[in-house]
Structures are given as structure tokens and as C-alpha cells.
């Protein structure tokens, strides 16, 4: 459960990251593909080389969806319903991959935000990304 303070920290951190969605998203995906190569199986039609147009485009989509989740933090299930359906029924993505990508997003935010990515911000974002992952995995149950 996110506290009011968590939500404030998430919003503040997101304000700093929002203008870098394509860059940060591509970096998080590239990090995931490198660290967890099994995740590449979901992208057989992509050029997965770092900085490719497809990785950048999908990275922008991923972080755009995350931005939507930040805006709708009090109603994640409704805000993420379409993505949850897509990943569960059409793409059939193993839900463990949401956690793997969440870890990579955390690293990218920490690298780019530096000292502004305090332990408190890290903890709040960890809870938030866990909540987003849980919502995306809801349809699997």
C-alpha cells in the first residue's frame, strides 16, 4: 500500500524522468535484454541492438504507460486494464518479466537521478513498481 508520502515522492521523481521517456525506456529495455537474455524471446521481430528504433519506440511506450500509472496511482487496475489484457491474453508474457523490467527501470532512474534518488524515493518507487507489476499480472490468476 502506497502512503501519501510515497505518492508524493513518486510524483516528484517522475516529474524529473518524464521528459526522458524514450531514452530511459530504451536504456531499461537494453539493460533487461542484456541482464536477462531470456526476455528477448518476446521480441522476435525487433532489432534488439542498443539504441535501435524499435527498442527506443517500445521504451517510450513502456515509460509512457508508467507515466499513466503515476497519474492514476489511486486506480491502477482500471488505468492498466488494457495493458494487463494485452500482456496476459495476446502476448502471453510470463509475469516474472514485469519484475525484471522493474528492476532495470529502478537502476536507470538511480543512475540518472543520482543523489536525488534517495533511499526513500527508491523504496517508494519499488512499492509502486511492485503494485504496477501486480496489476499487470492480475489477469493471469
Curated annotation (Swiss-Prot):
Pfam families: Globin. Signal peptide: none annotated. One of its GO terms (cellular component) is hemoglobin complex. Red blood cells. InterPro entries: Globin (IPR000971), Globin-like_sf (IPR009050), Globin/Proto (IPR012292), Hemoglobin_a-typ (IPR002338), Hemoglobin_oxygen_transport (IPR050056), Hemoglobin_pi (IPR002339). Keywords: Heme, Iron, Metal-binding, Oxygen transport, Transport. Heterotetramer of two alpha-D chains and two beta chains. The component D forms dimers of tetramers upon deoxygenation. Belongs to the globin family. Ref.6 chain was isolated from Hbm, the least abundant of the four early chick hemoglobins. This is Hemoglobin subunit alpha-D. It comes from Gallus gallus. The gene is HBAD.
